[in-house]
Amino acid sequence: MKLVLIFLIINFLLIINCENLIKVLDVRLAQTHIIPIEGKTWNLKNKTQHMSIIGNRRALLLASFEDLNKSYYVSIWLDNKIIGSLELKDPSQLPQTEDNGERYSTKHHSVLLPKEWIRPNMKIKFTLTESKDNSSLNIDSSNFFYPDVSQDYTLKMWTLPFYLFGANDTNTQPFSVTNGIGSEITKELMERWSCSDIIAVNHPIQRIDWPYLVMEPRNGNPAMLITNSDQKKDGYAIMNGVLNILTEIREAFGESTSSIQIYSPLLHLGANGKYTNPGGGLGGGSRGTGDHKYTFTFFHEQGHAMGLPHAGEAFAAGSYPYVNGSLLGSEWGYDANHNELLGTFIPPTSDQFKNCRRNSVFDSKGRCVKQSVMQGGAGDYSSKYRYSMFADFEMTTIQNYFKNSIYYDQTKGTYKKWNDTSKSYFEYIPSTKNNGLWGLDDGTPIERDIEVYTILFTYSTVGPKELSQIYPILKSSKGNLMKRYDPTNKNDMKLITPGSGSWYCFASGCDYTVRVTFDDDSLEHILLRQGKRKYWNPMGDFKENLYNATSSNSFILRGINVKATKSIKKVELLETLMAWKGISNATVLVSKDF
């Protein structure tokens, strides 16, 4: 009899609950953009792109109800337990639009959810009274809603200023200005980039001060050594050279497969001995360079660093959804620092507003629509801001950039990767892929946070001699060390000899070795995964154009780290053809005493 009574009571409560179910018309969450709670998906060129909510980042909850006149509460659930509850503000208190522009909505209640609540597998329920227990049978409640919350990740960025051709703190900008982006800039970047947090600090190398730069063959021009910025053959030549150096630094520090970014402010002198502006920027592959101001050039190039193309070109190719690289059709943005919504139209205090009708896309109300930051829209922002906004679609590229990276967990001393199916990190053990063809241990270091010297050098097969240089050595108090092979060690050579199962020398051969002499006359030999051979032929013919001055095959730029336990007396680049056969007949190609 008691069981029957309990059954009837439960069914009665369910009927009441169904009759009193709060009717919710729309639920959205806003971080960089206001998107549906289930995320947003695009299908372009037979490729599906999806934008999720980022975990461990605060989010503005917007909800519209059939009855606008009631007060509502939201409860956040995780593992079938309430982790928090808040009262929603009525629609009149929805955050304002930048520059007091048109309101986003007059129907949405809203509340800012703390970052600790934004986690995978969270659930949302709306009620008319505050929920303080874990009962899901509250009268006057809604169904559950299930936000698509994905990876939480911290964007780490190094800044590494380049002072070139005599540039210094006095005749250009002081290191205190160029060495980092500052907390206020970081706060605004957090509102524009899809990430949980940002750590932006000066690189362990601190800065690079070089009187010259060796430019690789480029655009039909041979390699050349330059000592002032006016000697460059094209506007991007120096910036391209800097990016190539950053590639070597990232690899030497074991960061090539990480999501760690690096940006280098470029300060150099012209032929007149005065500062010359770089005249733009260049970025890609987790690297960027440009001027020292950390404004639109920096913002644009770091978009490239995370994999974003120029939006106009992408639209023309069918891989960007909004006309001419604009934001027409993109969701509105949100800035939690200012607690205001960002329309997709150019605000009146923007420098671009006055003349925007000359070349803008217009919305249905005749307003000038913002362009993507990646297509000339870097200035389409309210005067209170430093940066404009990306399109919602571009956040998918940024999110994927982080999903595909390897992360080092400093607290555990282990690596991890993200599983987008389970919505969780898993411990990852780096391994050597493709038998070492493209490197060892997923490009991760074998030692961390030790004092290192970074040695960067160039070599030209055709000369003149000045093109083969060992740059001034750089020292870091906290650097990383990569696994390497010593060509004087027979056991090491057995591991990479062609035919042993290793493909370490199959990309272009193993024909070069760096020899470092320390102040106690001890030696260290580091075999480079670099050679003169054709692909997949480590003992065969030399590459085409190996001795063509205008071909990149005639030029080498490489960088390595070595332990800084002793001072360096000399660095040499040796020609060690098929090094696994022995290097007793090595030829010294480049040598420099320190």
UniProtKB/Swiss-Prot annotation:
Molecular-function annotations in GO: metal ion binding; metalloendopeptidase activity
Necessary cofactors: Zn(2+)
Localization per Swiss-Prot or TrEMBL: Secreted
Residues spanning the membrane: none
Cofactor note: Binds 1 zinc ion per subunit.
GO cellular component, one term: extracellular region
GO biological process assignments: proteolysis
Active-site residues from the entry: 301
Signal peptide: 1-18
Coiled coil: none
Keywords from the UniProt entry: Hydrolase, Metal-binding, Metalloprotease, Protease, Secreted, Signal, Zinc
InterPro entries: Dictomallein, Peptidase_M66_dom
Binding positions (Zn(2+)): 300, 304, 310
Annotated ranges, domain Peptidase M66: 147-408
Known EC number: 3.4.24.-
Enzyme class: hydrolase
PROSITE patterns to which the protein is assigned, alphabetical: PEPTIDASE_M66
Name of the protein in question: Dictomallein-4
Organism for this UniProt entry: Dictyostelium discoideum (Social amoeba)
